[in-house]
Amino acid sequence: MEHLLHYVWKHKLFPLKVLQTTNGLPVEVIDPGLQNPNAGPDFFNAKLKIDGALWVGNIEIHTHSSDWFRHGHHSDKTYDSVILHVVSEADTEITRSNGEQIPQLLLTCPEKVQLHYHELCVADQYPACHPILASLPKLTIHSWLTALQTERLEQKAQLITQRLKHCNSNWEDAFFITLARNFGFGLNGDAFETWAGLLPFRAMDKHRNDLFQIEAFFYGLAGLLEETFLKREQEDEYSLRLCKEFRYLQRKFEIGQGMDATLWRFLRLRPENFPHIRLAQLAYLYQKGDKLFSRLLEAETLADVRTLLDARTSPYWENHYLFGRPSSQKEKTMGERSKDLIIINTVVPFLYTYGLHKTDERMCERAGRFLEELKAESNHIIRSWSDAGLPVVSAADSQALIQLQKEYCDKRKCLYCRFGYEYLKHT
């Protein structure tokens, strides 16, 4: 019930009758204040009139008055700034740390709001607010999706900043590790990130002009050249040469063992997405030129970015998906849709993060422009919103809706969602 009271207070969904304190003094809410997501009073800098006198301060909200004492606020000076205690049941008087009494307001949640909130909580169909989506004003939809898109980019920027710290502020290394993770396309994302974290970048830089040696580094540290794993597939001349080369590189650069190859997942994967193929494409990207991220910073169009991400394989993989198992001849290039997913999940967040770190608004704007120009992703989340009547055109739209599901819908945070707000107040 308390979270509903927060909602009612924030949006001033008060009953038509005059508000009064529990002592009968009239209350006029001029400004409910700014909601506080952290520790401390629930709303900051509210502006009220109590019995005609202007008060400016903080608001605390509880279901019962006695929760004030149960939470220890009566002895916490942080809460001495509270000017009004809002409750749904007033079962006791409350005081500040100096014993001074604090006014209380008995506030009930409107029945209509309670009913609609219950509907959202028990809805089987996703999204729960689907009955009203098609009728929402375009401005409401656009403004919320724009905010969600920024929220998602900010969230990704925080993760990239953490990775950057682990990489000693080396943007190229951090970019490649993130690129590798997203080459897993979901199912093998964790495995690719584990693998990329083992890569000795400075050692590999010394052999960047030799694709075979880069492949030896890559497959060796991926655990795919281990004898037990190779025998599960089939050894052939190429895999044995790679294995021999990796052992040499291990000794030369004092490199540790590769990862556990059982972390790689193959079940229900299309052969084009097998780890062997994606590793070969990453090796091609790594070998064809250094400072990939720096070159992406100079790419002003999506066409330029796609060219830089043109990933192929060495000749061996044109007729193999696994070691020692020949297949029909087929060039293993990365499809345009896969490239676009890499741009959405790797390039765009890095451009945005770089712009934030360097105070380069141009980079942040370019990141947003790329999302607007790219087509929307196609997955079950996006299809659900589209089926509910929400227009999904660009990757900016789809990224916003993914953020909406993961951070609001899945967590049942309808009270913090603008679509949820529209649902609760509809007639």
Task: Please name every model-derived segment.
Residues 7-66, 79:
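N-terminal ordered "arm"
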Residues 399-427:
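Cysteine-cluster motifs in flexible loop/terminal segments that predominantly coordinate metals
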